[in-house]
């Protein structure tokens, strides 16, 4: 299921995509689940199926897509997490990948422009895979880790390489 957060006519909502249509379940669940983040913490498949038949539909072409989770608690990124990228950057081998943060206000929606500081001469952008955690935990065994994943998303990443230190 492709879940999305979007705006239409200045109003934010969320839903799921089916071909070229979004089923706007946010309109149906707004009183208890005002955004997608609050929905994925619950038994969201059951909630979606219970409201899908009566939810309004909107054309995908009539909305502006936003980041799926517009208000994340944390954005934890992993740098140098695969060997070919490490070699490409000329970095030495490391035992553990580098972790760094992003902030919610640095996210952009589909088709939005990325912000580049005028002071940078080495702005780099690339597509990344975002893993959206639906339920937290501590010291989760590897064989149980995917039980905590709510979904995946494409993610725009912009880096000011001349300021980067890792």
Regions found by a protein language model. Give the residues of each.
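N-terminal non-catalytic cap/leader segment that marks the start of a structured domain
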Residues: 1-97
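Glycine-enriched loop-and-adjacent helix/strand subsegments that border the catalytic/binding cleft
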Residues: 72-166
